[in-house]
């Protein structure tokens, strides 16, 4: 079983690239280890105000920090051909050996529809993602061996080529999922799983399916990374923590599927319907660091070995200092 690491979730839809890098470096100084950086072409709502290119930011994070780093998550299926994602990822790992992981997901219309193509239903998006992973892994494996490779599939074509800049060890491919079907496929075809905060019994079911898929492929699920991205709201008062959640991260209170919504302005209109009670069971909102510690510990006890924390407010520096002092040292594996 891997040791526990608690990293910083750099939300590039909220903070400009220079500030995101500074905050990640500050987090490491206060005991956080690693960075999960969001890949967005647009923010969730206009008030968030940013959407920088994740690979540029990760390269800068690598220069300023010593922990792991990866996109949380990128979609190798619409805006980006999987060959380009493979090249991005291989280059980052070549720059920072042993530190990079590739987090992928099936995509959301908010970011992916901008190229003007057909936006399929969820099942097809998942199928595209797993074919994209096949292309990425083909490129990784062939390139490590110094060979060319090609692919002709249902969704993607790759003519004979290789990655000419390729690290000795390919970065692990981690898949973001919240459903049991994809969790099983993730165990079978990927190297680890990423998910977000949810009821523990639901995540327990995901882990069961993930383990089932891994064993079918002859892999040990206990040796594969289990990664959590956890949104929370901390401030000096409960009232300010709630205000931060309502204004900065209203999407956290939306109890419906969001993958088909295309515009930050549409999200903004829907956010007007979000009420404080909508965050119940979805995100901890509290001024008490120990309340947050207890919530994080529950996920760690369930089996996560990496947790990336996102405080939804703009009070990042204060939050980093408080959690680095009062929360992280008290978490136990």
Q: PLM features: residue spans?
A:
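Active-site-adjacent structural elements that line small-molecule/cofactor binding pockets in enzymes
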Residues: 1-333
